[in-house]
UniProtKB/Swiss-Prot annotation:
This is Dolichyl-diphosphooligosaccharide--protein glycosyltransferase subunit DAD1. Belongs to the DAD/OST2 family. The keyword Transmembrane applies. Residues 52-54 are lumenal. Pathway: Protein modification; protein glycosylation. It comes from Oryza sativa subsp. indica.
Length: 114
């Protein structure tokens, strides 16, 4: 059992060192993803405590947060310089795709609200 604990500590330390070498723009995107998922979790907890009377509003909020997080992950994949699949794609194009997809997502969410 002590070996598993030391392996877990080594794993966490190596992940921390690897993440410290991550560029700042990717860390900002990661923070945005964490914020979006945390907001969705807060909405789910609120729904569990208070109730979900306007259920379409609850669904719209959660789907908006999760959809935005998914789009941000796609942006992170496209902007990452180590990713060889998107070498020819400029970061400006990836960001423009992100903004356009977010616009479409939120138009659909607003339409769902009624």
């Amino acid at each position: 059992m002590p070996r598993a604990t030391s392996d877990a500590k080594l794993l966490i330390q190596s992940l921390g060192k690897a993440y410290a070498a991550t560029p700042t723009n990717l860390k900002i995107i990661d923070l945005y993803v964490v914020f979006a998922v945390a907001t969705a979790l807060i909405q789910v907890v609120y729904m569990g405590i208070v109730g979900s009377f306007p259920f379409n509003s609850f669904l719209s909020g959660v789907l908006s947060c999760i959809g935005t997080a998914v789009l941000a992950v796609c942006l992170r994949i496209q902007v990452n310089k180590d990713n060889k699949e998107f070498k020819d794609l400029p970061p400006e194009r990836a960001f423009a795709d992100f903004v356009l997809c977010n616009l479409v997502l939120h138009l659909v969410i607003m339409n769902f609200l009624g």
